[in-house]
Structures are given as C-alpha cells and as structure tokens.
Amino acid sequence: MAKKSQIAKNKRPAKFSTQEYTRCERCGRPHSVYRKFKLCRVCLRDLAHKGQIPGMKKASW
C-alpha cells in the first residue's frame, strides 16, 4: 500500500511530463500498471477473476 503522502503527491499535476508515472488506482502500487485500466497486475487479475471487468476472461488455448 502506498503512503498517503505519495498518493497526494501523485494527484497533483506534474510540472513536466517526464515527472508523471503510473500508479494503481486501487492499491497505489507503482510497478506493472496497465495504463488502459489504471490497475496493477495483481488488482487486475483479482477483479477479472471476480468478473468485475467487462469483456475480460481467462485465456485458454
């Protein structure tokens, strides 16, 4: 879980575009965040298994 100060800092607009980085909207994790969903891989997998992300299902081939 991200610190409250980091979450507040991330919500502020950055002065330069290079200062912006993705962070999970649900848990605040900074790594392996899918831009399309704004979720980290852990949260994305959890929500997909629960069926809360429309159109996403487990792949099998």
Swiss-Prot record:
How many cofactor units bind, and how? Binds 1 zinc ion per subunit.
Q: Please cite one Gene Ontology biological process associated with this protein.
A: translation
InterPro entries assigned: Ribosomal_uS14, Ribosomal_uS14_bact, Ribosomal_uS14_CS, Ribosomal_uS14_sf
The record's listing under SUPFAM superfamilies reads: Glucocorticoid receptor-like (DNA-binding domain)
A cellular component term from Gene Ontology for this protein is: small ribosomal subunit
Q: Mind telling me which Gene3D superfamilies this protein's record contains?
A: 30s Ribosomal Protein S14, Chain N
Taxonomy, superkingdom:
Bacteria
Q: Which UniProt keywords apply?
A: Metal-binding, Ribonucleoprotein, Ribosomal protein, RNA-binding, rRNA-binding, Zinc
**Residues at which Zn(2+) binds:** C24, C27, C40, C43
GO MF annotation terms: rRNA binding; structural constituent of ribosome; zinc ion binding
Q: Which cofactor does it need?
A: Zn(2+)
Cited PANTHER family: 30S RIBOSOMAL PROTEIN S14, SMALL RIBOSOMAL SUBUNIT PROTEIN US14B
Main function: Binds 16S rRNA, required for the assembly of 30S particles and may also be responsible for determining the conformation of the 16S rRNA at the A site.
* Subunit details: Part of the 30S ribosomal subunit. Contacts proteins S3 and S10.
Name of the protein in its database record: Small ribosomal subunit protein uS14B
Q: Gene name?
A: rpsZ
